[in-house]
């Protein structure tokens, strides 16, 4: 069975170390893989995976990715899911004036994000598709 993992720590965890200890406990209780909370900064994912390996976490940690599909998500998603937006993405996000702008940015950023994940050895990616199924379909085409 799969469990959740939080590269930027769960909002209720006092710190990342405690959150990772909790993930280790999940593994020790039989978890076979983990899917991360969404993130926009791949370095946070890779750092998390490295620390997990140092703690003896050996289950696959599948990155969870969500593209923006609407203008409102640019501000809502990072706040709701407690994830940081890299400066480069934030700089582009402020230029978005319409849902179409946000959707295009979401496809562009997420495609690049996935390409980097694959290039650095990630085998699987989980897409959070709520309000973004068309975007995810386009990203999948971009990755072919």
Locate predicted features.
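Active-site pocket-lining/capping segments in soluble small-molecule metabolic enzymes
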Residues: 2-12, 50, 54-107, 112, ...
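A structural motif corresponding to the C-terminal end of an alpha-helix
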Residues: 29, 113-124
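Short, acidic/polar
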Residues: 14-25, 106-116
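Active-site-adjacent beta->alpha loops and helix N-cap segments on the catalytic face
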Residues: 13-17, 38-54, 132-143
């Amino acid at each position: 069975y799969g469990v959740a993992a939080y590269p930027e720590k769960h909002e209720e965890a006092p710190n990342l170390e405690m959150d990772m200890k909790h993930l280790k406990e999940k593994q020790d209780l039989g978890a076979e893989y983990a899917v991360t909370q969404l993130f926009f900064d791949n370095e946070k994912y890779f750092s998390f995976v490295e620390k997990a390996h140092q703690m003896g976490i050996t289950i696959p940690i599948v990155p969870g990715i969500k593209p923006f599909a609407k203008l409102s998500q640019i501000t809502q998603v990072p706040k709701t899911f407690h994830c940081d937006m890299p400066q480069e993405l934030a700089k582009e996000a402020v230029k978005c004036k319409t849902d179409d702008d946000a959707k295009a940015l979401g496809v562009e950023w997420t495609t690049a994000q996935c390409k980097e994940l694959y290039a650095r050895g990630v085998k699987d990616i989980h897409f959070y598709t709520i309000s973004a199924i068309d975007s995810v379909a386009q990203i999948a085409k971009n990755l072919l």
